[in-house]
């Protein structure tokens, strides 16, 4: 038991020392929470541009969609793949059809 407590303490102390040399991470979030259609494509495009503008280090998409138009999903997928900022997706209930295609393009699900 004492060994486990010592190990946890060492890990926490190590994390604190590593934190001094790191820059603050800017996380940009937005939702995909309706049908994948031209309006959602515009919304995602504007969100990704805003993330670049604020110099975000990470983008998190909260997704809850049953899908939609595959051509719009492909446009969103292309935007995600071409962006240099890592993008994580949090699937909050559903990512069906076009939503799954978009999720797979992200760096982490």
Language-model regions, residue ranges each:
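Sec-dependent N-terminal signal peptides
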Residues: 4-13
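Soluble extramembrane regions of membrane proteins in the secretory/endomembrane system
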Residues: 19-109
């Amino acid at each position: 038991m004492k060994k486990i407590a010592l190990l946890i303490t060492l890990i926490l102390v190590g994390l604190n020392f590593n934190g001094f040399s790191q820059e603050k991470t800017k996380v940009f979030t937005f939702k995909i929470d309706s049908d994948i259609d031209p309006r959602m494509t515009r919304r995602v495009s504007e969100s990704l541009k805003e993330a670049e503008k604020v110099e975000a280090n990470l983008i998190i998409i909260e997704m809850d969609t049953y899908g939609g138009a595959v051509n719009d999903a492909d446009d969103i997928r292309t935007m995600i793949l071409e962006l240099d900022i890592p993008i994580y997706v949090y699937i909050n209930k559903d990512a069906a059809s076009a939503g799954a295609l978009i999720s797979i393009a992200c760096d982490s699900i």
